[in-house]
Amino acid sequence: MKFNKNAVGREIPEYLEGIGELVPFKGVDAIKPTKSKAGAKLRMRIQDEKKLVASIEEAIKKSGLKDGMTISFHHHMRNGDTVVNEVLDIISKMGIKDLTLAPSSLSSCHGPVIDHIKSGVVTGIQSSGLREPLGDEISKGILKKPVIIRSHGGRARAVEDGELHIDVAFIAAPSCDEMGNMNGRIGKSACGSMGYAIVDAQYADHIIA
């Protein structure tokens, strides 16, 4: 394995299986951006088309989710979130595998993700946080690909420039109308601002809320 030194003298591998080529940190302001923003898919609503469906499973089928894709979630529900676990349970029953899980963060309530890693449903994680027991198990090497951890701002940048492409974003919205307009201000599970999910809603190929 070949290595390059970063700005603080630490040797960083040139390439990691499951991630690809690595660019070492060269120092503050050392690299000027040359990329363009990724283009979001253009969408149109056919007259009288209904966006509401009867179940999460039906929504997943309509999204076209398949093996090898990337799915995302936000973490505004903090340790009370059940959406990640419920969605992965449904995806598992549908037989979909080899997914990259790209949430804004994962909390202690997401321990059930461990079983989906072991069964091959989830093979990669890109997040801004991992906590026990999930983090402990991943540290033991149960995940097929190396985890990518970014700051919250770094995650938004990665989605905007296409480094992290989201195929289907699952947005836990306390309130949402049939046109897809949503907010966190009202509803039984009102959580306040949903800033972490904005970039997902803007750039994901499909949004399920």
Features from the language model and the residues they span:
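Conserved alpha/beta enzyme-core scaffold
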Residues: 1-209
